[in-house]
A protein has these predicted regions:
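N-proximal low-complexity "stem/linker" segments adjacent to membrane-targeting elements
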Residues: 39-101, 319-362
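Short, acidic, metal-binding catalytic loop of nucleotide-sugar glycosyltransferases
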Residues: 100-109, 361-370
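A conserved acidic beta->alpha catalytic loop
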Residues: 116-132, 152, 351-356, 377-381, ...
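Glycine-rich, basic loop-to-helix element that forms the pyrophosphate-binding segment
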Residues: 150-167, 378-391
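A recurrent flexible, glycine/aromatic-enriched loop bordering the glycosyltransferase active site
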Residues: 157, 165, 215-240, 244, ...
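Short aromatic/hydrophobic "clamp" motif used to bind/position activated sugar donors
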Residues: 172, 396
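Conserved donor NDP-sugar-binding/catalytic core segment of glycosyltransferases
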Residues: 184-215, 403-447
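Catalytic donor-sugar/metal-binding loop of nucleotide-sugar-dependent glycosyltransferases
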Residues: 256, 266-284, 311-323
């Protein structure tokens, strides 16, 4: 059987298993055993014993035949994609890999816009000379490659703006000077644009070793989540946006150097009507000395700029909040400021009076004082709904009698989230006695049920 048929069979098997019943089983497994064990099991299923991510990835790469077929596809919408890259004394092997990965694209309507800021006062610097020789050679070989040589290094944001000035496409893609695209990256982007008319979109990614031979640490991202984006720049690479939106932003801002892309992404999604996610690994993020991908602490200023980007986003959209670093760099915690302290009705449900009394005492000792506490006589839904009708509070907090402890500022945090426009409900994470996740929120089903 051919490799292509094997791939199709694998996709079919996965799609057959991804049904309502198995999703339900998955949530039940998490409830009983915790996320850590579930993730271990999921990895074992996805990457069988003895199979590394690299092997899995190479098995799922498009074949030469598939790439050939992609080149023959005629989309009804065929946008020119302008890929912008600021280069700075890029190691020649990385530079070649980066440019070659664009030239190998199965979707060929692109332009590569490079602003080189390698010059740092010495025109005879060997690094500068070699980079510019390579850029000259590539731009002579392929007219889709545009290069501007800057008189000095202006910083990553301003250098990127110089690359943006070269762009004439309908969409702009952000690309780092030492990373690589998969050969089907632009094809998948354009396919998604044709299918869904996205204003901005992003893809999954992984890390690539310094010698370009090993793939690791894949990041399979969720669909667009504004709240998650405010906790972590999970979008990162590969990010593509309509030029009409980019033009309205006024480019990158140098005061966010290090996280200028984070700030840029926030401002793009604020203007976008449709944000899309292409759930395929289409971008390889290079790991090497000095790269954030290799050592997070090597660029602490980047994380400080990220914190500033989130804070600025909140100010633009009218959310009163304070952002702080979490222990793991690159993750941020938001403290929402309470504009007022509305009455919260805590509705405790259960059948054990002693447990309900103990649960009630927990809430009386918390930071939030404007409370009323109501307790049901059992777990009957009608009775709980009747208490909700009776409640005087602006917010209703439903909690089981089995709750044994609550973070001191839990109500303050959750009420703060409810102040955000378009947020109608919020839920916290519930940890069981065995340190397993009992609950981590609710979702709406397509039929409207929770």
């Amino acid at each position: 059987m051919s490799e292509g048929k094997n791939k199709k069979m694998n996709v079919k098997q996965i799609s057959e298993r991804l049904n309502k019943e198995n999703v339900k089983k998955g949530f039940e497994y998490i409830r009983r055993n915790g996320v850590s064990r579930f993730w271990t099991l999921a990895k074992a299923k996805a990457f069988p014993a003895g199979k590394s991510y690299k092997e899995w990835y190479e098995e799922h790469c498009p074949t030469k035949e598939e790439l050939m077929r992609q080149r023959e596809v005629e989309f009804s919408v065929q946008p020119l994609i302008s890929i912008v890259v600021p280069t700075y004394q890029t190691p020649i092997p990385f530079l070649k890999d980066m440019i070659d990965s664009v030239r190998k694209q199965s979707y060929e309507k692109w332009e590569l816009c490079i602003a080189d800021g390698s010059l740092n006062g010495d025109e005879n610097d060997t690094k500068v000379i070699r980079v510019r020789e390579e850029l000259n050679r590539y731009s002579m070989e392929d007219k889709r490659i545009k290069v501007v040589y800057l008189e000095e290094n202006q910083g990553i944001a301003e250098n990127t703006n110089q690359a943006l000035a070269l762009a004439t496409g309908e969409y702009i893609g952000l690309f780092d000077h030492d990373d690589m695209l998969t050969p089907d990256a632009l094809y998948e982007i354009v396919k998604a644009i044709n299918d869904y008319d996205y204003d901005v979109l992003y893809t999954d990614e992984d890390k690539i070793s310094e010698d370009s031979h090993d793939y690791k640490k894949p990041v399979f991202k969720p669909d667009y989540s504004p709240e998650l984006l405010c906790a972590n720049n999970y979008i990162t690479h590969f990010f593509v946006a309509k030029k009409s939106i980019v033009d309205r932003l006024g480019g990158f801002r140098k005061e966010y150097d290090g996280s200028q892309d984070y700030d840029f992404i926030f401002r793009c999604v604020e203007l976008a009507k449709k944000v899309g996610h292409v759930s395929k690994v289409l971008y390889h993020w290079r790991m090497h000395g000095g790269s954030v991908a290799g050592d997070p602490t090597s660029k602490m200023y980047a994380y400080d700029a990220g914190k500033k980007a989130i804070q600025s986003h909140y100010e633009r959209v009218g959310i009163q909040a304070y952002v702080e670093h979490m222990e793991r760099l690159g993750l941020y915690h938001t403290e929402y400021k309470m504009i007022k302290q509305p009455l919260i009705s805590v509705i405790i449900y259960g059948e054990d009076d002693e447990k309900k009394k103990r649960c009630s005492e927990w809430f009386k000792r918390k930071d939030y004082s404007n409370l009323e506490i109501l307790a049901s006589a059992g777990i009957n839904v009608e009775e709980i709904n009747a208490l909700a009708e009776k409640a005087r509070g602006s917010y209703l907090f439903f909690v089981s009698e089995n709750l044994e402890s609550v973070e001191r500022d839990a109500l303050q945090q959750m009420a703060g989230v409810l102040q955000i426009q378009n947020v109608g409900a919020v839920s916290g994470k519930v940890i069981g006695r065995k340190h397993t996740v009992e609950d981590v929120g609710v979702v709406f089903r397509t039929n409207g049920d929770l």
